[in-house]
Amino acid sequence: MFNTSTFVYIATTADTKGQELEYVRQIIANLGLPTVTVDLSTSSLPANPAADICAEEVAGYHPEGARAVFCPNRSHAITAMALAFERFLLTRHDIAALLGLGGSGGTAIITPAMQKLPIGLPKLMVSSMAAGDVSVYVGNSDIAMLYSVTDIAGLNRISRRVLSNAACQIAGAVRFATAHDIEEKPAVGLTMFGVTTPCIKMVVSALEPQWDCLVFHATGSGGRALEKLIDSRLLSAALDLTTTEVADYLFGGVLPCNEERFSAIARTGIPCILSCGALDMINFGPPETVPARYAERLIHQHNPQVTLVRTTPQENASIGRWIGEKMNACSGEVRFVIPGGGVSALDAPGQPFWDPQALAAFMQALESTLRPTNKRRLIKTAYHINDPRFAHIVTEQFQHIANPRLLSK
C-alpha cells in the first residue's frame, strides 16, 4: 500500500533536461503518485520553473554555501552539487523513490546521493553512461541503471519509450511494493566464493533457525556491501570466512577490496568470525588479461572469463600480516579460524593449488602479527575449509560470541 505522505522524487539538470523532467513527472502523476521534482543545474541561469525545488535551494546545502556550486569550473561545480544534493536528500523524510535522469554530469551528481539512501528504497538512474562499467555509480547500493540509448537531449521516438518505461518502473516499485514483516531474527553477513560454497552452506544451515543469513559474493563489491551494512547497523554479526579480496587488493587482482576492509567490524565492535577462504588465488579475467609478471606462475583457468593465479608463500605471509593488523584494531569479539587442511576447493590434496607451505606462511605471519586478547583470538584446526568438521567448529565459535536473543533487541 502506497504511503500518501511520501513522494516520488525526480532529479535532473533542468536547464538542459527540463522537457524530459516534465514528461516523466506527468506519467508518474497520471499513475496516481505525487512527485517532487528537483533541479540540479550547475549553471547560473534563473531558476527553472519546471522544478518544484530549484538548484539554488539544493546548492545551499553545500557546507560552503551555494557559491561553491555555481563556479566557472564545471568539474568542481559537479562535485560540489553532488555533495549538496547528498546533504539535501538526507534532510528529506518523505522519499518513496528516487528517479534520476542524466548524462555524464547528471549521473555523477545524482548517484552519490542515491548511494546514501536505504537499501530497498527504489532508486533508478536513467543515464547515457549506463552501457559501460557502472560500478562507480552503483557503489554498494541497489541502484538500478537504465541505459538511455539516445542522449537525454530532447524527446524523440526512442527517448519517449525509454523515459516512459523508467517512469512506469519507478511507479510500479512504489505502488506494488511488497509488505515486509518485521524480522525478529538478527541478521548475520557471510562471505562466499564458489570454492568455499560447501562451507558457507553448512554454516548457514546450522544458523538459519536463529539468524537471518545474508550471503555476499566476495568479489570486491560484495565485501564493500557487507561493510556498508555493518556500518549501517543492519547486521548484528559477521562470518567473514572468504577473505580472498585481500589477495586481489595487495597483488593487483580484479576483485579487490580496499584499505577499509574489516574496518567496519573494528568501528562497530560486532561479533565476527574470520577465516582465510580462497586466499590461495588472485583473480583475473580471460587468460590474456593476466599481467606478464605472473606468466611463469601456477595458473588455473576457472572458466573462460576467470583465470586464477596461485598465491606464493611470500604473498600469503604479506596477507597474514595485513589481516593481523586489521584484527588488532578490533575491540569486539573476533575470532580467526584457520582451516589447516586447505583454504579452497582448489587447495586440497590432488588439486592444482594444493600448497601446505603457502598456508603455513600465512598462519605464521598472522600469528606473529596478531596481539591476542580475551576477545581477539586465533583458533587453529586441521580441517579443510569445506570439511563439515571445520564448519561445525566455526558455528560453535560463533555461537559462543553471538547471542541471537540479545542481538535481536
UniProtKB/Swiss-Prot annotation:
Which CDD domains does the protein's record reference? Tm-1-like
- Pfam families per record: UPF0261, UPF0261_C
> Which Gene3D superfamilies did the record assign?
Uncharacterised protein family UPF0261, NC domain, Uncharacterised protein family UPF0261, NN domain
Q: Which family does it belong to?
A: Belongs to the UPF0261 family.
* Name listed for the protein in its UniProt record: UPF0261 protein Spro_4740
> Can you name the source organism?
Serratia proteamaculans (strain 568)
